[in-house]
Swiss-Prot record:
Composition skew (Polar residues), residue ranges: 169-180
Similarity annotation: Belongs to the RRM CPSF6/7 family.
Gene coding for it: CPSF6
Region feature (Necessary for nuclear paraspeckles localization): 81-161
Organism: Pongo abelii
Protein name: Cleavage and polyadenylation specificity factor subunit 6
Length: 552
């Protein structure tokens, strides 16, 4: 009897399995997800998801279509259709996604899985959502892209490997662009909107009701904590393209929170999420279409990110400005600047103080996301509530305004000046080496000194890359100078050697000549002696002959 019951159970499960396969029809994506996508997301293209995927509870219907009878009684054994929902912010939680799906009339959500980076626990910006009917999947694909989640329109695609790879590539590009902007060290600083996705955390995706506790926001935040999200009807500005700079002033906490001191450590994880940002490809300044989604409390009236391009993580931060308080809805009146929360300033509606900086010190705004005080021109108000400074006129040393006037350079201008400095450095070094090789050390030294002076006078001379160029030019200059000094001493040594050799040759010639003269003299004297002897012999013979003749 027990065997019969076992057979009945086994056949019932197999029948369910065949019925499910027949119901799926063209939707083999579920098997593809179960057998291919999940291992590849854990062990293949995205190994960073492994820890999080392993900690998830077993999903409903994971063993469907795997050819093995389930040993657990599931509460749902019917049809399951999986979809990818992408183009999400990194702090979008499963509760936000669930509420957005429920608002469309879809109530048969079976599971939600967020893909996360293993290194830092941040969301990759897309999730896997399983629903229980074809009608729900069609409704999600048709209506969810028209809704807005944290200022971005989700993208709904079928669950297959092609769309998975597309979302993975998009996540990698976004991460790389955020690291290139210098945002890998801290979360979004308060009072300024971030260029790309902040490194602050996001609530991890969970099954509805599976993991107890509130939202979790892993990852450190910026100095002073992240600011609250933008009010309804306003989206964050477009990322800037300038060089990395220090973070701006800290933002305000939500109501009821104690304001941390500036440059404080990371706040409580889970009390405040980072602000939403603009997803790449969304038009700049486009207001959201729907009301503010549920989440953290709205921002304190009178505070918020500035309307102009936000500052990067180096350079002087521009003054942050608030959004005027207004209920959720369409975009309100124009934005005005006001002081940050940690500094005194006039209340909203009070007449603004005089500008604290001469507008002539600010360059005209550019379209490249310059971190100037405002992209529309000089600041209309004093962001820190200080009185106008004493006018020095044309006397005395320049103040901090001259330094700030040199730093606001767009990325295009910075790269142009750096390329020009590199060209000056390389051409000066090559010309100096060629001049030094032919012995023209004066021209080589003059070329290098001129190049060093030009690079030091450029606007980016304080940059480390410019300092490297200057040090290489100085090293080349020192080498050529030492070579020129060594060549001068060698020339003097050669001249001395030539003089010595000439004197030696002269002395040798003189000695040889004196010896020759001496020899000639002795030869002449010997010849004269021989002549005298010959004459004496001749005289003696003549005398002998005369004597003989007389005797006869």
């Amino acid at each position: 009897m027990a065997d019969g019951v076992d057979h009945i159970d086994i056949y019932a499960d197999v029948g369910e399995e065949f019925n499910q396969e027949a119901e799926y029809g063209g939707h083999d994506q579920i098997d593809l997800y179960d057998d291919v996508i999940s291992p590849s997301a854990n062990n293949g293209d995205a190994p960073e998801d492994r820890d999080y995927m392993d900690t998830l509870p077993p999903t409903v219907g994971d063993d469907v279509g795997k050819g093995a009878a389930p040993n657990v009684v599931y509460t749902y054994t019917g049809k399951r259709i999986a979809l990818y929902i992408g183009n999400l912010t990194r702090w979008t939680t499963d509760e936000d996604l669930t509420e957005a799906v429920h608002s469309l009339g879809v109530n048969d959500i079976l599971e939600i899985k967020f893909f996360e980076n293993r290194a830092n626990g941040q969301s990759k910006g897309f999730a896997l959502v399983g629903v229980g009917s074809e009608a729900s999947s069609k409704k999600l694909m048709d209506l969810l892209p028209k809704r807005e989640l944290h200022g971005q329109n989700p993208v709904v695609t079928p669950c297959n490997k092609q769309f998975l790879s597309q979302f993975e590539m998009q996540s990698r590009k976004t991460t790389q662009s955020g690291q290139m902007s210098g945002e890998g060290k801290a979360g979004p600083p308060g009072g300024s909107s971030r260029a790309a996705f902040p490194q602050g955390g996001r609530g991890r995706g969970r099954f509805p009701g599976a993991v107890p506790g509130g939202d979790r926001f892993p990852g450190p935040t910026g100095p002073g904590g992240p600011p609250p999200p933008f009010p309804a009807g306003q989206t964050p500005p477009r990322p800037p393209l300038g060089p990395p700079g220090p973070p701006g002033p800290p933002g305000p906490p939500p109501p009821g929170q104690v304001l941390p001191p500036p440059l404080a450590g990371p706040p409580n994880r889970g009390d405040r999420p980072p602000p939403p940002v603009l997803f790449p490809g969304q038009p700049f300044g486009q207001p959201p279409l729907g009301p503010l989604p549920p989440g953290p409390p709205p921002p304190v009236p009178g505070y918020g990110p500035p309307p102009g391009p936000p500052p990067p993580q180096q350079g002087p931060p521009p003054p942050p400005g608030p959004f005027p308080p207004r209920p959720p809805g369409p975009l309100g009146p124009p934005l005005t600047l006001a002081p940050p929360p940690h500094l005194p300033g006039p209340p909203p509606g009070a007449p603004p103080p005089a500008p604290h900086v001469n507008p002539a010190f600010f360059p005209p705004p550019t379209n490249s996301g310059m971190p100037t005080s405002d992209s529309r021109g000089p600041p209309p108000t004093d962001p820190y509530g200080r009185p106008p400074p004493y006018d020095r006129g044309d006397y005395g040393p320049p103040g901090r305004e001259m330094d700030t006037a040199r730093t606001p350079l767009s990325e295009a201008e910075f790269e142009e000046i750096m390329n020009r400095n590199r060209a000056i450095s390389s051409s000066a070094i090559s010309r100096a080496v060629s001049d030094a090789s032919v012995g023209d050390y004066g021209s080589a030294i003059e070329t290098l000194v001129t190049a060093i002076s030009l690079i030091k006078q450029s606007k980016v001379s304080a940059d480390d890359r410019c300092k490297v160029l200057i040090s290489s030019l100085q090293d080349c200059l020192h080498g050529i100078e030492s070579k020129s000094y060594g060549s001068g001493s060698r020339r003097r040594e050669r001249s001395r050697e030539r003089d010595h050799s000439r004197s030696r040759e002269k002395s040798r010639r003189h000695k040889s000549r004196s010896r020759d003269r001496h020899d000639d003299y002795y030869r002449e004297r010997s010849r004269e002696r021989e002549r005298h002897r010959d004459r004496d012999r001749d005289r003696d013979r003549e005398r002998d002959r005369e004597r003989e003749y007389r005797h006869r």
